[in-house]
């Protein structure tokens, strides 16, 4: 993964400005708020406001907001599960209770991050399923007729067993299929260009483009919504390309809200 690191004078930290991996790109555009914003949003219930971040006090508050329980209660639960609870039903009950413990996510939503992303159309189609707390504006080929870039995937085998989704290791003939894919996809792109040059409307010509062409979009959300996406898309059951993209997003967001990001993602 290629990363562009900048020094942020306002935050007095070095942070990731953009990431690129296998043709996919994520770039920082803007953000609002900090871990202190999360703290003050929580304190609003008591009519209070802090002017400086106090790690000794505020780290614990943010962890409590994300878990729905104090650090002491969390450690007690972990200790019981690890050393004291042996009955399978008791373990299942404790895990169910932890999973369904009411959390306090609203303070995290008083933040805002805007990113610019370049991904294959097939990956974009998965990302737009994340709707809660997000807004997306995508380059439209109704209006843009530039020659699209092509994503070259790593072709992997079907998963073993009865699993219907996902993929396994790199296919033994991956290089052959990459060559075939590139030849067919580039032919489709040339056809698209020829159709536009011949006077076909871009919104009609785009139907010949394959799922592997790149698209660009502006993506805005809060730290809680991005963390939810990160947790779901870094799971081993997700497609590898979207796992990679989620990690790229995390590289940019984590330095902006380090305590909140850790509390929400465990990173």
Language model: regions and residue ranges:
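Family-specific signature for flavin-dependent thymidylate synthase
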Residues: 1-267
